[in-house]
């Protein structure tokens, strides 16, 4: 089957931003103008196409990254609409991993918010080229150039306006296109009747000034264009487009557009810019991976290359399990067998679909550069690589943040225990930041996630989709343990009970690992002191012991263990004996390595009228918060602080009463830090008292 669109005319883009910047409305308008939907759906009416879960339609926020295909100007555009709420960071993270370009949406009033910074960092992590759409230009207080300056200052981006609004707030009547040097005036409410016109005389001077800045910035990055610009003082529309595109692909500049998705102004120009400036799959670096030999390799974006794809999302729905994939190379056909190289398992492709939110179109194949979904995969989860059985490769996977909050959960009726277990398994398959475990002491089922809203929505889904009513305990902080110094550890397990005995013996060196490494194991056994077949079990014994630290039973992270020596017995040694010896050595070593307790620290931003600034700062300090920045603008104060999550429960209520209901705050995970000694002692004694 031939391609519908050549690879050069494919765009895989994400629409990302902070909450309430208008991402989903922007996506809806894109679908309307490109002909996918014939009626505009509003988020606040609960009718948005991309918000297809019941909870999304009720809450007016996007929870899961919905993938949709559309076309514009003879280009295929695959769009992922991502959530702006920090509890759903993994959805943004996994979509960034598979995208080629991003439209970052900012509110013309709110500007750069803490969540905008998080999304920007995620795009930086995966080197995703981007453009900006400053939305809500119809709102009171809208200021396009102020937001442009914030993007430059706070996100350190070379933000370059390629448009100017004509009017603002209630008088937004059109948009000046600085590249084409003309104006577009909107003549009807639906935004379908657009008049191309000269730039209004009262804005000619301002437009000329900004066009000159645009030409200078674009020329700076291109030797050929700088010569033309220095000679003639002018660049043509085509030269500007070429220069902007090259600047975007090299991460040298970020074009900034404006409009109001809700008022149907500026969205078609955003689509034009996607086609003109954002990369096709062939414009970005080929995906890297590792061959079975351990050698690094790349897969070019080409239908004729060996097949490779990354599973970036798993979802259960009434028709079965849907696995979303980004095709990097080759062709994937319905009915074929492929290899999951991450898990070394064979999978059969029963059906392939392209999604239009909750509608699906069945296809016979997916090709390099496509975003689609597979039905029928049994073993594949988020972050796994699918490839040809003859040409195996494991692609770079996703960064998955640690959960920061946990609650105990139990079914309201004993008979629902099995249903609860099935529901939790299905939900954790879909969402790698949602973890399920059993407390060994209380035997309670514990669920952990990225925040209270995250867990609340998952519990809600258990009721709606799996018909399980559950009782939820009070939220608990997910503490961690780590070590601060190095030491040796030894574990010898010897049992003789008549007949065949048990013998395993290992000596290890322990030291702190780099932050984020988790458990790192290095084998330095020489001369066969520990046979090869027992090294894996010894490592597994240590890794399992990591799950429960020595201070208060919390998981131990960022520990490097080097296996240096040991001994074995020809008859009595076994995998189990070495697993136990590994665990004993680990426990012995960790006690001597100055273990400490860690707690999740949250990046908090509080916005309130400046009369309450003193109270807000005082309250944050009383919560062990470190104030990192503050500003006052137009009578509104903003405070940035780092506060332990343990101190933030109930903060929303306290802030409301402290600011007479006029304060708002946002919170996101920053990092794990050591708990002060007096606080740690209380946590440790409480946990030891419970055990």
Curated annotation (Swiss-Prot):
Q: Name one GO molecular function term.
A: translation elongation factor activity
* Gene3D superfamilies registered for this protein in UniProt: 3.30.230.10, 3.30.70.240, Elongation Factor G (Translational Gtpase), domain 3 (3.30.70.870), P-loop containing nucleotide triphosphate hydrolases (3.40.50.300), Translation factors (2.40.30.10)
Q: Which domain of life is it from?
A: Bacteria
Pfam family of the protein (one): GTP_EFTU_D2
Which PROSITE patterns does the record associate with it?
A: G_TR_1 (PS00301), G_TR_2 (PS51722)
Q: Which CDD domains match?
A: EF-G, EFG_III, EFG_mtEFG1_IV, EFG_mtEFG_C, EFG_mtEFG_II
Q: Where in the cell is it found?
A: Cytoplasm
Q: Which SUPFAM superfamilies match?
A: EF-G C-terminal domain-like (SSF54980), P-loop containing nucleoside triphosphate hydrolases (SSF52540), Ribosomal protein S5 domain 2-like (SSF54211), Translation proteins (SSF50447)
Keyword field: Cytoplasm, Elongation factor, GTP-binding, Nucleotide-binding, Protein biosynthesis
Transmembrane residue ranges: none
Report the residue ranges that make up the tr-type G domain in this protein. 8-282
Give GO terms for biological process.
ribosome disassembly
One CC-aspect GO term: cytoplasm
Annotated positions binding GTP: 17-24, 81-85, 135-138
Q: Which family does it belong to?
A: Belongs to the TRAFAC class translation factor GTPase superfamily. Classic translation factor GTPase family. EF-G/EF-2 subfamily.
Sum up the protein's function in the record's words: Catalyzes the GTP-dependent ribosomal translocation step during translation elongation. During this step, the ribosome changes from the pre-translocational (PRE) to the post-translocational (POST) state as the newly formed A-site-bound peptidyl-tRNA and P-site-bound deacylated tRNA move to the P and E sites, respectively. Catalyzes the coordinated movement of the two tRNA molecules, the mRNA and conformational changes in the ribosome.
Q: What is this protein called?
A: Elongation factor G
Q: What is the source species?
A: Prochlorococcus marinus (strain MIT 9301)
Gene for this chain: fusA
């Amino acid at each position: 089957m031939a391609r519908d669109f050549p690879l050069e005319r494919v765009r895989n883009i994400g629409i990302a931003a902070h909450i309430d910047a208008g991402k989903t409305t922007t996506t809806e308008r894109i679908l309307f103008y490109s002909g996918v939907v014939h009626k505009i759906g509003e988020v606040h009416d609960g009718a948005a196409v991309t918000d297809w879960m019941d909870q999304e339609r009720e809450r007016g926020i996007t929870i899961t990254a919905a993938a949709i295909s559309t076309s514009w100007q003879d280009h295929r555009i695959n769009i992922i609409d991502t959530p702006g709420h920090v509890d759903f960071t993994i959805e943004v993270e996994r979509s960034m991993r598979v995208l080629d370009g991003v439209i970052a949406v900012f509110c013309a009033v709110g500007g750069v918010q803490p969540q905008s910074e998080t999304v920007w960092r995620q795009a930086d992590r995966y080197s995703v080229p981007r453009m900006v759409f400053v939305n809500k230009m119809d709102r009171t207080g809208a200021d396009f150039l102020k937001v442009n300056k914030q993007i430059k200052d706070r996100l350190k981006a070379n933000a370059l306006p390629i448009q100017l609004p004509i009017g603002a707030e209630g008088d937004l009547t059109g948009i000046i296109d600085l590249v084409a040097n003309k104006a577009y005036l909107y003549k009807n409410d639906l935004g379908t009747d657009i008049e191309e016109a000269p730039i209004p005389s009262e804005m000619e001077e301002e437009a000329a000034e900004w066009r000159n800045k645009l030409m200078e910035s674009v020329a700076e990055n291109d030797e050929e264009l700088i010569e033309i610009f220095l000679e003639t003082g002018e660049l043509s529309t085509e030269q500007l487009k070429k220069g902007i595109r090259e600047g975007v692909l090299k991460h040298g500049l970020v074009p900034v557009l404006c409009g109001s998705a809700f008022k149907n102004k500026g969205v078609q120009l955003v689509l034009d810019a996607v086609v003109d400036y954002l990369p096709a799959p062939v414009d970005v670096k080929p995906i890297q991976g590792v061959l079975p030999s351990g050698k690094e390799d790349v897969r070019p974006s080409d239908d004729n290359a060996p097949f490779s794809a990354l599973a970036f999302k798993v979802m259960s729905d009434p028709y079965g399990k849907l696995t979303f994939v980004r095709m990097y190379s080759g062709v994937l056909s319905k009915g074929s067998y492929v290899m999951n190289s991450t898990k070394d398992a064979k999978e059969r492709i029963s059906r392939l679909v392209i999604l239009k939110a909750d509608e699906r179109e069945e296809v016979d194949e997916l090709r390099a550069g496509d975003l689609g979904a597979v039905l029928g995969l049994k073993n594949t989860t988020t972050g796994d690589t699918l490839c040809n059985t003859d040409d195996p490769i494991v692609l770079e996977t996703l960064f998955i943040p640690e959960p920061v909050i946990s609650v105990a959960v139990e079914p309201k009726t004993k008979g629902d225990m099995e249903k609860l277990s099935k529901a939790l398994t299905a939900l954790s398959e879909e969402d790698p930041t949602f973890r399920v475990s059993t407390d060994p002491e209380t035997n309670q089922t514990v669920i952990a996630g990225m925040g209270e809203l995250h867990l609340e929505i998952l519990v809600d889904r258990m009721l709606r989709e799996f018909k399980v009513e559950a009782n939820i305990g009070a939220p608990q902080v997910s503490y961690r343990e780590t070590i601060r110094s190095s030491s040796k550890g030894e574990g010898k397990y010897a049992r003789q009970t008549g007949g065949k005995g048990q013998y395993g013996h290992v000596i290890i060196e322990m030291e702190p690992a780099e932050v984020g490494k988790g458990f790192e194991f290095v084998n330095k056994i020489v001369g066969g002191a520990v046979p090869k077949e027992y090294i894996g079990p010894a490592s597994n014994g240590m890794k399992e012991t990591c799950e429960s630290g020595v201070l208060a039973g919390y998981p131990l992270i960022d520990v490097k263990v080097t296996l240096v020596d040991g001994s074995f017995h020809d008859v009595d040694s076994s995998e189990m004996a070495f697993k136990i010896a590994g665990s004993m050595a680990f426990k012995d070593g960790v006690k001597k390595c100055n273990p400490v307790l860690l707690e999740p620290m949250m990046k908090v931003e509080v916005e309130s009228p400046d009369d309450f600034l003193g109270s807000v700062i005082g309250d944050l300090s009383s919560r062990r918060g470190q104030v990192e920045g503050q500003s006052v603008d137009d009578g509104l104060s903003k405070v940035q602080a780092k506060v332990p999550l343990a101190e933030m429960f109930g903060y929303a209520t306290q802030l409301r009463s402290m600011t007479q209901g006029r304060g708002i705050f946002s919170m996101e995970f920053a990092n794990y830090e050591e708990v002060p000694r007096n606080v740690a002692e209380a946590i440790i004694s409480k946990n030891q008292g419970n055990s």
